[in-house]
Amino acid sequence: MDSVIFAAIAVLLSKLLTNNNESPFFYNCLACLFVGLFILTFSKILESAGWLATTTNYIWPICFILIHFYLLKEFIFKNRDISKFKRSIIYLILIITLLEAISSEQLLVMVGGAYLFTIVYCLYKKIEIPKLIYLFIIIILFNFIYDFCCPGNINRVKVVTKLGFPDYANFNIINKLDVGINYFLSWILMAKDLFSVIFLALLGVYTYLISNKNKITIITLIPCLAVLFFASLRFANFTTVYSYFDLTNLKHGLLSLGFIRMLSCGVMYLIITLIPLYSIYLIYKDNKKLGYFIFVLLILGFGSVIISGFTPSLTSDGRIYLNYLFVMIILDYLLVDKILEFKNKN
């Protein structure tokens, strides 16, 4: 069944992100390549709590939400003329896939954010918002209320805090944000996954291309080079320098460090944050829809990790990054498509 889920994710990526009908085989293979790389490179994370437990709790919901947004795009926003029976079936599938997806707390935050950004986009573009969207918003809000008020979740936090991380009880909102932001940025800076490195490289290349190869835009490749530098330190076994910047297992956040180390890591964090934001700004100037979409996906990926600072279980053996990694896969796939599209036009 997991094989079917992974295959479905690859197909849905191709269906959702490309409008190129000339070479569907290439784009399907590209999607399969990214999903296959994910399985190979993160099999240890998938096995950390048991393969079946991890895939059903993390991977299956991703498949469900891709199905949900594919149907939303193809049948709700395009308002296709179909029979009432087929429309009823689609509505039912939309509701079921949404409920299955938001059973995951991380995806609940991401899907809620996705719908918020969708509504903002529709209002800005003066696109009529389908009435069904309001039903989905209500479902999401009820799930938020349930997750935050459920006695079981409240007791679980108390038990995990007491047994696993007593210091968490003294964390204020600044500490929690600090921990979440540090986990996100340190993971990227230390090249803990291949897809973030690919994203930074593709983002720099695409920005350089659309800016008519303006030399100043070469700076957009700096984050990728910085990340590759730390990756080379790890493979060359220069553990002293690498360990100095590696804060991916730091439970108390960046603010708990000494001033010099905090400043050093903070500067690197600014580099891998501000320069990609500059790239996205240039993309937005060239193609507002694409720039907005990339920005939204990055915010959703960021949100999926930052909420780890609001739970005493913290990193959970890397599983907190699984949703973020699929955001990176989507962005990598999209940027490859846009770079090829740009080359074909020019």
Predicted regions and their residues:
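Transmembrane-helix motifs of polytopic, lipid-linked glycan transferases
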Residues: 3-29, 67
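Membrane-interface micro-motifs in multi-pass membrane enzymes
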Residues: 29-30, 34-73, 258-278, 302-332
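Transmembrane alpha-helices and membrane-interface helical segments
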Residues: 11, 67-74, 114-122, 202-207, ...
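Transmembrane catalytic cores of multi-pass membrane glycosyltransferases
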Residues: 1, 52, 106-113, 120-123, ...
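Membrane-interface alpha helices of multi-pass inner-membrane proteins
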Residues: 85-111, 141-142
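Membrane-interfacial loop-to-transmembrane alpha-helix junctions, especially the N-terminal start
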Residues: 22-32, 83-90, 128-136, 214-225, ...
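Short hydrophobic alpha-helices at membrane interfaces in multi-pass membrane enzymes
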Residues: 74-98, 134-135, 344-345
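Signature aromatic-anchored transmembrane alpha helix within multi-pass, membrane-resident enzymes
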Residues: 221-224, 271-298, 340-346
